[in-house]
Amino acid sequence: MANDMELGIETRIEGVVEERGVIALDAKIFSEIVRKLPDSDVTIETDASFKTIISCEKAKFNIVGKSGDDFSYIPYIEKNESIVISQFTLKEVIQQTIFSIADNDNNKLMTGELFEINENELKVVSLDGHRISIRNIELKNNYEHKKVVVPGKTLQEISKIIPGGVDDDVLIYLTDNHIVFDFDTTTVVSRLIEGEYFKIDQMLSSDYETKVKVNKKELLDCIDRSTLLVKEGDKKPIIMNVTDGNMELKINSFIGSMNEDIDIEKEGKDILIGFNPKFFID
């Protein structure tokens, strides 16, 4: 169990318990020790002064722990109606949206993601002032309308530890102040970000004048090649000149220039537009 008062994670594993007890260990040191141990059985022993021995095969670590009496346990959350989605879907959704959250606290809401439940649909939204990511998931059941903002840190940690099985589910519980994710033998409890999220629908146009269909890999490879001429921190845009059946991509920097044509299908007007290549790759 770990808890920083904003995010708490509890997991249960099988083992041989010779004597029950509680001890608090430095999370970083403990995780690094376990990560570097051989793939074999691990023994953890402690004494009355909280000195702890962690051994595995021929490796043995001695570290100092603390009493678990003062440990801040994960708050009890009453679990009412659960929202059920597959582990695979949740992990995929996080990966497809987490890149466009803000990485600073200038606007707290931008450091999280909107989870909006409406009947049998879950909408997940993130934005950082430059990009907006939206993913819609169809749910098996109908639910009352709810909107919460989940910290990006919470979703990043879940993405790291969730197995992501297609046939394995995640149960999500919502309260006024917390969100709970239950999967396998792990429970994640997180505080929510307070405040009214941005009105995304008002930011997006409903009458686009140009629609382009393009091979994703071909476009990605082309933009990736263009970044060879852009140094880190340089804000040179990649220019896209869209005409019937063709998209010309070009970039100019003090290093040099590059242009490439890609076959496309286009509906609507021709357009000349520029984008940050890194944002577009993301």
PLM features per residue range, with description:
Residues M1-D282:
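Structural preference for solvent-exposed beta-strand-turn elements
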